[in-house]
Amino acid sequence: MKAGDAAREVVKMSGKRSLVYGVGVNDWVGNISVGGKMIMEYYLWQDMLKRCFSEKYKQKKPTYKDVTCSKEWLSMTSFIEDVSQMKGYGVKGWQLDKDILVKGNKLYSKDTCCFVPSEVNNLLTKRDNARGEYPVGVHFDKYAGKFMAKLKINGKTKFLGRFNSPEEAFFAYKTAKEAYIKVVAQKWKDLLDEWVFQALMSYEVAIDD
């Protein structure tokens, strides 16, 4: 079923006509703004819909090309009912993530999403437009004629070495990145959902990440 058709079904059930990005149904009971500012619940839902249904956003973020959400989450009320039960909901600096529990996931839904600190979320963000022709973490040093591996840690670039092939450089990056992910996971262990922690501890960096 297409998102638009699903939205019309939800509209019919709720009796509301307020569509967000042409599909989202604002069936929230109460005001969505207080003192001229959107409530946190509305902003969170709207931001999720933007990533799923805004063509302008997808042009800027190609990795979201095929991303969508479950039929249930077209309803603001259903969305908030689900995410409010997730550990980390409403915590300042935490973000809704769709990729950690299911790597490569394209669906925002109750079973595929979780909340994580921005440090964790940014750690796993794909940046295809910044990668270039080589694997993630790899750059060619034209002066040395070798491939360099680099990893950003706490905003600073760590040099991992020079190698004869992009594959060797990537393996160095992969090893360092997976180790760093585990360090960050341990840092947040007591606050993360157990499933999220385990997903981070077993996370594998792929050459096309």
What are these regions (language model features)?
Residues 34-38, 46-54, 60-146, 150-151:
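Short, cationic Gly/His-enriched loop motifs
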Residues 79, 138, 149, 163-177:
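An aromatic-rich alpha-helical recognition segment common to small helix-rich domains
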Residues 21, 120, 128, 180-209:
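Extended, polar beta-sheet/loop recognition surfaces of beta-rich domains
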Residues 65-71, 156-167:
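A short, exposed loop/beta-hairpin motif centered on an aromatic-Gly-Thr core
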Residues 24, 97-99, 136-137, 161, ...:
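Glycine-centered small-residue hotspots that permit tight backbone geometry or close packing
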Residues 1-57, 62:
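GGW-centered surface loops in extracellular recognition modules
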